[in-house]
């Protein structure tokens, strides 16, 4: 179908005639719009000069259309009331759903598709058309005129939907499943139809294969510019596996069984579809569509296997090569890494697989964790979902990236840019040159994506490091506070100890224990370790900020974008030349742009890899710091426990000493200030009678504390003398003091003595 200007306004009730959508096999197709409901339909009407045979075909098309119901076959609609009266003849009108996306030919003719559709668009197209053909064949219908003009596009909820139209040449199979008449489009015609031989559904296989090849490469597979007679005599010489018969710039005809370059398919799909095209483009009808695994007509099942592949795309940042792997639903990441090692030589332990956001692929999840559905993006995205492979054994990355090899025709004009080419040769070569510049730009963007993924991963590690730094600082502050408290406390204790020595109370063991504690806490704190780590982290932070500020740390446009746009403009001007100006010419301007693009690519790659090496160095520093910070935090936590333990031990020793002293005082005073007097304190033997039992009851396990307590008992006599002097001086004021702390019952006294023990 081809698009035409608007027609003179004509109405039928609420329906208004709009533009002509195109011309089909028997007549015109016109868009009508309902001004009340907003509904749109396509009305196909026959030309008046149809022969009786074609009038019968037209009626057959309407019958076929009205009984078909499939999402990839355009649906028939009811002809609005009264519209049949507007028909130019007595033949019935055919009303169909309107697909606003236009036909596939219009889509293929867009400049961007000169070297084939994007991968996602190809997969979507193959899926839809295969489904439609299956349906038609199951309903015993051969289309016979499958071509881009007879496929229209409709925007669905998630993607573009392709629908087959124009069944004007469709033929219902008779009981023998053979047909002998045909009038169709020669360029997509199966050989047996050209030869007017009997045929089956395999004629649609040939047309489908030709259509698929054109969508993949941007041109038809077999000498597209040759006349039918010469075409037939030359192409029939191809082998059963040849899928390309082309003419080079020297006029030499070449046969090939390989998919031509360039195209937009990944390596796995290119290989699988190459095998599938060999099935579809077999010259002999009986062998066409026969799959080795699924047998006759097994080409659709073979295509299903291809369309259902789950592919992981790995960009090796060491070489710049993309490796594509079909993976099973439950395949482990370790299994994928083993396959990567076989292709790249990078050990599994050294492989780091990053997604674009810098996230590491999780080892406990399957290899499919990074796959999205490429058939839902309508083929509009320029990039596949990439996983970036880094070699952790490398501390720096060398620039090992070179531009991809050029197609043969492009290499030819690079060597001879002044060589004159025909218009059709120039159109193909210039399109390939433009595509080569596009490819350079996309390859550069992918490498930069990999560098940014490494940068994002560095920032994630740096974020973890910053959190650990904050935790280290918090732990250091807490430890310092406890150390300061402990040191201050022990200094006070030592000062008070020196003051009380005037009363004659001394303990070398107690003093030695306190001195040992004081020395022990001096080993705690880790202030120097913390300081060194903080300095290293601050230096790393400065390096990371410098990386982020670098222009290459962000997505850049630049020279390649400009050169690609200039090449596109040159190609557009060539394509839009009037027919009378389509003369021979050279390719100097396009070659100049390609050479500049190659130089710009190599320069950008050097900058990207310089940035990547700096990123890798920073990441290595961050990874080295992480365990060191963890270790210092662990040691500080141990130091904190040590300080707390020493503090508790010192306090227990003080309280043990105090309890023993108090027990010697409480015994003679019997807990009553009224009965306390000097005479009660004048019997050293009585005062010394209780501590021995307390000492005997001390646990054997705490030997050091027992020794200190024993020494304290030895000092009791000195303490009694001091207490007697104090009691004598304040005997008169005892009754005014608060002695409630001595009001204890015998059970409490026993409990305290047991606690002391």
UniProtKB/Swiss-Prot annotation:
EC nos: 2.7.11.10, 2.7.11.1
Gene encoding the protein: Ikbkb
Signal peptide bounds: none
Spans annotated as Leucine-zipper: 458-479
Protein name (record): Inhibitor of nuclear factor kappa-B kinase subunit beta
Sites of the Glycyl lysine isopeptide (Lys-Gly) (interchain with G-Cter in ubiquitin) crosslink: 163
Subunit structure and binding partners: Component of the I-kappa-B-kinase (IKK) core complex consisting of CHUK, IKBKB and IKBKG; probably four alpha/CHUK-beta/IKBKB dimers are associated with four gamma/IKBKG subunits. The IKK core complex seems to associate with regulatory or adapter proteins to form a IKK-signalosome holo-complex. The IKK complex associates with TERF2IP/RAP1, leading to promote IKK-mediated phosphorylation of RELA/p65. Part of a complex composed of NCOA2, NCOA3, CHUK/IKKA, IKBKB, IKBKG and CREBBP. Part of a 70-90 kDa complex at least consisting of CHUK/IKKA, IKBKB, NFKBIA, RELA, ELP1 and MAP3K14.
Record-listed ATP binding positions: 21-29, 44
